[in-house]
Amino acid sequence: MKKLVSALLVSSMAISLVGCGAPKAPAAAEATTAAATQAAAEATTAAPAGPEAITLKVWAPQVDQVDENSWINVMLPKFEEAHPEYEITWDIGVCGEGDAASIVKNDPAAAADVFFYANDQMGTLIEAGALSKLGGSYLETVQNNFSQTHVDLLTYTDGGVYGFPTSPNTWFMWYNKETFNEEDIKNIGTMLEKGVVSFPMDNSWYTGTFFFGVGATVFGPQGVDAEAGIDFSSDLCVEATKYMIEMVKSPNFVNDVDGIGVAGMKDGSIQAMFSGDWDQPALAESLGDKLGCAVLPKFTMNGTDYQMKSFASNKAVGVNPNAKFPKAAMQLAQFLTSPEALLSRYELSGYTPAASACAEEEAIKSNPTVATLNAQMANTIAQPVLAEMANFWDPVKNFGLNILNGSITADNAKEMLDATMQLLNSNGL
């Protein structure tokens, strides 16, 4: 049979598919004494009670529930098959990963039991009492099925892991294969000698790549130590600043702003740029087989190569600690982020799967963009989720702007970097 429930606070649709299967002792029996239980068992030969009736409220992105063949509507019946101990009423609502915190925190008790969220919202959700910390077999599953980077991205200041990863998010390099060969793309200096390279020097999500490449940290090695602050103070960071100064002076350098990179790649005036998988459709349409993608290149300072590194973030499935049926909610979150489920989501919704095992699947290996995104995750630092991260974006953006306009020079590089450090840690860190 099917059960329907009322609409959610968010735009929603309600569906229900009831599972059935192996019988389970009723919860009421647990309240009786051992003697009464034994007497009742001896007094009757009636069939044992059926599955436990539960309701699970799930909020997922619109793309995952467009129609009955969409991912979430395919996976929920499979969860029922895997858990015949439950008779489940499904309450399904639409809520994108980027909107989860703003909606859930308003009334955590009324929010979904299981929801999808972007990891930069983790702190807000935890502080609102709306996100469960994983433990036991659930924590072990995350640690075993996902890379350490994905685990770190969902680790909070208390050391707890607060979600099941679904998909990665970072940036890498796009290039024109007619200009650069596989050897060229290993070093950005070599590329600047052969073709026009576009890089968003004044976009702080990208600018830090050279600092990260020489060991700079943002709130410690794992990005969760507020007291450690943002540390761009090393001599190598000064040298990296000088490298950036020389880089923007190259006649083959173009600052990527307002879509210049994509436009230039499409018309042929630019041969390499840096962004993520979101630009793949536009670039592939124009370049076809000429389009290549690769992990970030290295850069050379004083004869030593350093690896450019990007910020990494991810998206996850979280469980609300206010869930009426917390065990079932945890089981569902775990089920939806299994390698098999995430591969299905890739096929039906287009999300790159975060599970390590998925990288070995032919569907993933045969997609250069997805393979590159997964490979780049190994050359990243975790984008911190601390509130203090708000101090990062504007000072680093302005640092990049001052490199572009010539205000920062080789002579004042250390002085300007020190001044930026003060702004980055201006709240007393």
Predicted regions and their residues:
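Extracytoplasmic/periplasmic substrate-binding proteins
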Residues: 61, 75-76, 115, 247-325
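Extracytoplasmic/periplasmic solute-binding protein
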Residues: 162-166, 171, 188-230, 236, ...
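Hinge/lid segment of periplasmic solute-binding proteins
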Residues: 41-43, 47-48, 119-172, 183, ...
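Glycine-centered hinge/linker elements that transmit conformational signals in sensory
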Residues: 226-255
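Mature extracytoplasmic/periplasmic domains
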Residues: 281, 315-390
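Conserved N-terminal structural module of periplasmic/extracytoplasmic solute-binding proteins
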Residues: 6-7, 17-123, 300-303, 419-429
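A structural signal for short loop-to-beta-strand junctions that line the ligand-binding cleft
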Residues: 101-105, 110-113, 140-175, 196-200, ...
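Conserved C-terminal helix/tail region of periplasmic/extracytoplasmic solute-binding proteins
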Residues: 375-429
